[in-house]
C-alpha cells in the first residue's frame, strides 16, 4: 500500500462564512462553512458545512455536510453538488478528521 501525503498538495481554507441554502421543502437553512479545500487527486473543490445553531456539548454530534463546490464559467460561486463516491467520502473524512484534530490542538495552547 502506498503512503499518501496530501499535505503538500491539498489547498485548505478554514475561514468560516455563513451560507443560506434551501432544504428539500424549500425552507431556508443557515449553514456555517467550516472548511473548504481543493483536492488535486479528484480535481474538485469541496466545502464542509455545519448547520448554524446546531450546537452540541460534544463536537462529534454536530452533523457536517460535505459538498462539492462546482464553480461557474467565471470560476466563482457556482453550485453545491452532493458527494457521490466512496473514495471521495473516505478522503473527506480523513481531511476533516485531520483538520479538526489540528484545530482542537490549536485551542489547547491558547
UniProtKB/Swiss-Prot annotation:
InterPro entries, A to Z: UPF0473
Domain of life: Bacteria
HAMAP family (UniProt xref): UPF0473
Family, as annotated: Belongs to the UPF0473 family.
Entry protein name: UPF0473 protein SSP1146
